[in-house]
Amino acid sequence: MERTLAHVPSMELSTEALLVTGGLDNTNKMISSSAVRNDDGTMISQHSDKVSYGTSGAPDGSTPPYPAGGVGEGNGIVGGGGGGGGGGGGGMVGDGTGHSVGSSGSGNDDDKPAKQKRHRTRFTPAQLNELERNFAKTHYPDIFMREEIAMRVGLTESRVQVWFQNRRAKWKKRKKTTNVFRTPGALLPSHGLAQFPSPMNDSFCNFHGQDTRGWPAMSGMTTHMAPHMTTHMPSHQMPLMGGGPGSALALPPSLPRQGLGQSMQQQSVNCSMGQTTGLNTLSMGTNGSMGSMTSMYQPSLGGMTTGSMSSGLSSPSPPNLPVTDSSTDLSCSVSDAGDMWRGTSIASLRRKLEHAASLNGIFR
């Protein structure tokens, strides 16, 4: 071994380098191989470019061999050539110029194809006008129509197809939002408030304050009733028999006992005032007339005497009962739009008013 090292003095440097990087086993193998080459003499140049492999990580040789050093090009010494080679298992191969070429984990990203960048198609006004004109004709053009449009506007068929898809989505979205606010019936009832009559409507009450046709009949009726009422009524309960609208309006509506003439006059005036009072006056009249009218007409007409008549006439009467006469129609008609709370009271009031009309015929 000493003789071999003496013949090859340049191997000392490479041996020291391999002791540091590759390990003792690897160094011994390389030294023996170099000694054989030096004894032969003629094989030095032939075997100078071979790579010696070592098993520095596993002495039993179970792992695959890795290059222990670099390959020196042109000097015949393994690991030489100006800094070629790394340690055992380093995977670096020296090229003799001081540069090492890596062979692991390099250049994988360059193999992937570059992702194609999508660009946005910009339509000219002429192209948009042509596309909109065809969209007005049909929303779903076939392949032949799309190709024809693409030739006219200078686009590809796929671009035309995508434009029609986007345009259909936009049209459906706009249609969905406009259908909600197009008609008020979608949010409000279609009839609105037309079925409820306004308080100032003329059809709400047929008898007006300016119509004085019913006053002569009322005044005549009260004059016939006056003698019967004076015999059995106190002086503080005597009604004012003026027979006009002014006297009827001057009476307080909250007297506990009133005559039939006064109550009828107040009822007719209240009917004429229905334009200003509205639904509240009518509801008060219909609700108050249910219980008070039952005690007024309890006695029968056949056996009615002057005393019973006066007691019946002096009983409390509803303040807002509308009166009907055979000569003048004073009924307050309400539009029958489905108001169930008025239907029952109107039928009962109609029967009571017929009873009042029969009493009017008796006094005449």
From Swiss-Prot:
Q: Which SMART domains match?
A: HOX
Q: Which residues bind DNA?
A: 116-175
> What organism is recorded for this protein?
Paracentrotus lividus
**The keyword Transport appears for this protein:** no
First and last residue of the signal peptide: none
Which BP terms does GO give this entry?
neuron differentiation
Q: InterPro entries from the entry?
A: HD, Homeobox_CS, Homeodomain-like_sf, HTH_motif, OAR_dom, OTP_Homeobox
Q: Where is this motif: OAR?
A: 344-357
Gene3D superfamilies found in the cross-reference section: Homeodomain-like (1.10.10.60)
Q: Where in the cell is it found?
A: Nucleus
Keywords from UniProt, A to Z, are: Developmental protein, DNA-binding, Homeobox, Nucleus, Transcription, Transcription regulation
Q: What is the taxonomic lineage of the source species?
A: Eukaryota, Metazoa, Echinodermata, Eleutherozoa, Echinozoa
Q: Where is this region: Disordered?
A: 35-120, 303-330
Family per UniProt?
Answer: Belongs to the paired homeobox family. Bicoid subfamily.
User: What spans are recorded as compositionally biased (Gly residues)?
Assistant: 69-99
Any single GO CC term annotated in Swiss-Prot or TrEMBL for this entry: nucleus
GO MF term list: DNA binding; DNA-binding transcription factor activity, RNA polymerase II-specific
Q: Which domain of life is it from?
A: Eukaryota
Role summary: Involved in larval skeletal patterning.
The record's listing under Pfam families reads: Homeodomain (PF00046), OAR (PF03826)
Q: Any idea what this protein is called?
A: Homeobox protein orthopedia
Question: Which SUPFAM superfamilies does UniProt cross-reference here?
Answer: Homeodomain-like
Tissue distribution is: Expressed at low levels in lantern and tubefeet.
